[in-house]
Each structure stands twice: as C-alpha cells, then as structure tokens.
Amino acid sequence: IAKNVIYQNSNTIFKRFDWLRRNEEKTNLNSHNIKLNINNPILASLKNKLENSLNSNLTNSLEYTQASLKDKNPFKNIRNWSHWSHGDISFGRVGEKGFVKPKDIRTRGIMFGADKLINNKIFGLAFRYGNDDVKIDNGTGSKLDAQAYTLNMYGSLPLDGKSNLNSLIGASFLSIDQLIKNTITGERYGRQIFASIIYENENEYTRHNLTPFGKFEIGITQLSEYTDFGTSATNSVDVHERLTFKTGNISGGLKFDDILYLDEKTLSRNGFVEYIFDLTPDIDHFYKNYHDNTSVRKTIKKHSL
C-alpha cells in the first residue's frame, strides 16, 4: 500500500508533464481524464472503449476556462492557471506463486491539480484521494481497506538543449483498517513523505521520436502502533509496534511520441518502456501477544509494502 500511494501520485503527475509538452501550442491546457488499469487480459480488451466514452462525456459536461501556458511573453500569463483532474481505477490479482496466497487488489483514486508557467518553468500543486482494497485469499476473509490523502508540489525545469528535469515532493496521511469477515479487527494510521525526480532528453532519436529518461524515487512511511483484536474464534490479541521504513526505486527507459497522418486525420501514438529496480529492503517489525506478552519478529517482504 505504501509504495502504491507513491506510485499513483508520481505516475499521474509525470503524465501531466508529458501531456503539457504534447499540447504546448494549444491555448487551452485544461485536462480532465479517467484511466482504467485492469490486470485481466479479457477485460483489458474492453477498457479503451470505456475510457474514451467516459472521457468524452466528462469533456462535454465541463465548461473550460482559457488559461494559456504558451505565450510569447511569459510574464503576461504569470497569473493564469491551468486546471486538470485525473480519475483512475485499477483492479487485478497479484502474488499467486507456489504456496503464497494471491491478493485481489482494487484501487480507486481522483486527483485535482493546477499549474502555470513562470519564466518557462512549470510549477503546480495537486491533491489526490485514493482508496485501496486488498483481499487476501487465505480462507479467513482477511481484508485491508486503506484511505490515502496526498498533497503534491511539482515543477519542471528546462535544461540546456532539449532536456528537462521534472520533480515532485508529496506528503500523505494514511488510514488503514484491517477486517476479517467484514468486521474491523484493527485500525492503523500513518504518514508519509516522498520525492521523485526524472530526467528526460528530448533530442529526437529515430523517426518515432524516442526519448530516453531516468527516474529516482524515495519515500519514508511511518505507521502507528495498533492492536489486532482478531475475532472471537481466534481469541487472540496482538499489539503491533510503531513501524518506520523507507521505500525507493531507480528506473530507466524510453518514451515514444509519434504522429501518424491518415488522409485528413491524424493519429497520435505515445507510450513508454521502463525497467524498474526496487531498492526497498525487507522490513522487520515486532508485535506482542496480549495474553503471554511474548515478543514476535515478523519480516515483511519488499513487494508487500
């Protein structure tokens, strides 16, 4: 959950940078989108049609205000802001390997942001609310229900030539409920700070306009102490200590952005290929059983954070 909160925020904001550069000649830089991520090959084939329908209806229902970030005189529009929003829904199953029980994950989020151009530099603020439901298929009906409220500050700095340095810092408040058969057995709160930076070289490589990039991301999360009351059937009460841990990754890849001309129409093709190396270590945490006061150490694998 901790890493997913960081990923959802940074991924959405960095896509905003890409969108701004693809549309920098437009006078209207407002944007409102809905994104679906489905880890199911059958359902994934239907998502594009649904996304287009939702985005079309959303666009038609909104009355845009002109707020240009592209002008010959950058000081003229120094007070103008472009506003944007992004909704995302993700669901799928992960972690099914050998004797490891799979997890069904459903993530929903909405982000609202505003940005403007100051002396050819982009500055913006964005707020995201996210809800993560994680169901563990272990026969007990275990589930985690997490709420995340995140404030982001982001910016883009043009470097020499056609290179850009995009960065963001964010702070989150987390609320996590542990449930067994829809009964809350534990409540935990957390806070989180994180930063992400990406370097892009926009010199054109090949006719598909390939753009190499490198990214570094780091976060610190602190979870409060909490008591797991279990159920009447388990008759077990465990007190978990406060937990502070770091997460991070380094990645690199290629983006492509190409326009295909078809008679009187144009088709914009863009995407990216990325390799991510996870720097997060396994985390040890301790808890005590209320009845015998025995301290137990448990290791959380990095892919579970």
Task: Name each model feature, range by range.
Residues Q8, R22-W81:
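Outer-membrane beta-barrel biogenesis signature
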